[in-house]
Amino acid sequence: MSRFARLLLIVALFFTGAWAKTVKETLRITWKEGAPNGQARELIYTNGQFPSPTLVWDEDDDIEITVYNEMAKNVTVHWHGLDQKDTPWSDGTPGLSQRPIQPGNKFVYKFKASPPGNHWYHSHEKMSLVDGLYGAIHIRPKGDRTGLWSQISQDKDDIKAMENAAHDPEYLVVSDWSQYTSEEYWKISTDSGLLVFCLDSILVNGKGEVYCPGQKFLQAELAPGLVEDAFPPGTEVSDKGCFPADLDQVQGGPWNITKRPDLIPPRVQEGCVASRHENATIVVDPSRNNGWVSMHIVAAATIAQITFSVDSHEFWLYEIDGNYVNPRKFVSAVMSAGETFSVMIKLDQKPGRYTMRIPNSGASQVLGGFAEMVYKGCESEEKTGKAYLSYGGNPTSPDVEKNSFFPWQLDTDHMSPWPPNKPRPGNADEEHLLVLGRVGAPYNYTMNTKYLYPVDFQNDDPLLFYPNATRDTENDGLVLRTKNGSWVDLILQVSTLPGDTSSFEHFMHKHGSKTWRIGFGAGVWNYTSVEEAIKERPKDFNLETPGLRDTWITAFSIGGEAYWSVFRYFVDNPGPWLFHCHIELHLMGGMGIAILDGVDAWPEHIPEEYQLC
């Protein structure tokens, strides 16, 4: 090698190292009493705080995180939205990539900080997300985003200001909260024979209150037409805003089990007890970044479907699930459990205190959530501004409804990737039909007609190390296998199983890769291929500008009409990846499936430190 060539190599290595640095983090997981909404219960703390610390890295950093389990129960940590390319052993999913971290033990996760954007991390052991292990992740990008910001403003100062604002955003981790731990909550359902999904609070950055505005107020806050379309005449919510637990429209069936609503403890469904505590306050400075502020929002909810709005402030939605999208302006946006949004807000209003309204917008419960956005220097305690949402999440005017983001409406959920990124047209190489719904009990959920994914499935023999462990067994119905380099279509059908024709929506999350939603329609999927469906229903498909995400809603009709969705992805990341509903009750009830992507190129050289003993 010549002296000049060696010099070039040294320079190249220098700049490569300048981009990629090693970042080491330590997370200590503990269990103790706390009262984030003013009412005490035991919960998970991470490094002594709740929610877990926000982690900020640069794209392509080498990340090394040591997790110490100082609880008396198992834990794992999943890095939601990170692709884990070439590091499937660090995905944090028990039974697929690792064994659970047992009490007193530790586990070291190593991976690249990729892709850039807004992500989050959370526990993935049983229903323990309910107990509070979740935090935001922000991976700052290397690339130029001028083309993204120029869709919002052509002003050069604005473009630079938005880039700076996005580099240093505000973080909102939004979660739902119950007075019961995850184990207690699940036991209520199995003891009573009823699916219970009534909550106490919506928290923002671990802060909130318990509101008891009265039953009549809550009844008036029901979404227009909800009772008429979905429930028997005269159905009323409780003083917590919850529908009666034993309604057939809620529980489905009939199931061959005994329903015991009398075994639901007091204050679960009704018997609201208010508590004054504190709501999160986000202080914003209109003198910085030309008056622009970016907010990264994590829907760390376990049941609720939340709606985000800030009084008197429009926002530009520019990122979903860590993927940049062509920005669109809204006044409110519905987020499903597991999703992440990034929004850009212009601070162009009178300095003051503006309420951030973040209610549950799903059909499960009328429940309000709040925080405050306060202009820096504002000394008044009085709130100001025009509300876009009511307590229960209803638009306050027809104009608000027209300018809101609804994931179940394709005209508003047309958020195409920036820069353009579309899937292969025509047929995929593989197609898999998954029929979702309930089987046997109100709390049992399946993704393939009948099989329930156990929460401890393959915990002792993770599929990364034993990919053929389920072959020739009934458990192989819980596993899909794909080939490396193939295009795959996942066809999801909802509301067709016996006893589950009025199924609630599901929030479907795939580990290891994002998917394009290329098709979506009402009815029963009875086509021999996606290609046939495209020919017969071309208006229900979009292969030119489909959205690209890792979490999608399966739309539903409250009246019971069936729906299907088609998700396409390219297999280039061999490993065992969980595909599941991000509603914790549904996953606990069995709504998951293991996808072994690239079985013909399975990881052979697993680092020694990750090898099983």
From Swiss-Prot:
GO terms for cellular component: cell surface. Cu cation 3 binds at residues 124, 511, 580. Gene3D superfamilies: Cupredoxins - blue copper proteins. Pfam families: Cu-oxidase, Cu-oxidase_2, Cu-oxidase_3. It is found in: Cell surface. Belongs to the multicopper oxidase family. This is Laccase 1. Residues 1-20 form the signal peptide. Pathway: Pigment biosynthesis. The gene is Mlac1. Its cofactor is Cu cation. Cu cation 2 binds at residues 80, 122, 582. Its EC number is 1.10.3.-. Cu cation 1 binds at residues 78, 509. Binds 4 Cu cations per monomer. Glycans are attached at residues 74, 256, 279, 444, 468, 484, 526. Cu cation 4 binds at residues 506, 509, 581, 586. PANTHER family: LACCASE-RELATED (PTHR11709:SF488), MULTI-COPPER OXIDASE (PTHR11709). Residues 29-142, 171-359, 468-598 form the Plastocyanin-like domain. Keywords: Copper, Glycoprotein, Metal-binding, Oxidoreductase, Repeat, Signal. Laccase; part of the Pks1 gene cluster that mediates the biosynthesis of an anthraquinone derivative pigment that contributes to conidial pigmentation that provides protection from UV radiation, heat and cold stress. The polyketide synthase Pks1 produces 1-acetyl-2,4,6,8-tetrahydroxy-9,10-anthraquinone though condensation of acetyl-CoA with malonyl-CoA. The dehydratase EthD and the laccase Mlac1 further convert the anthraquinone derivative into the final conidial pigment.
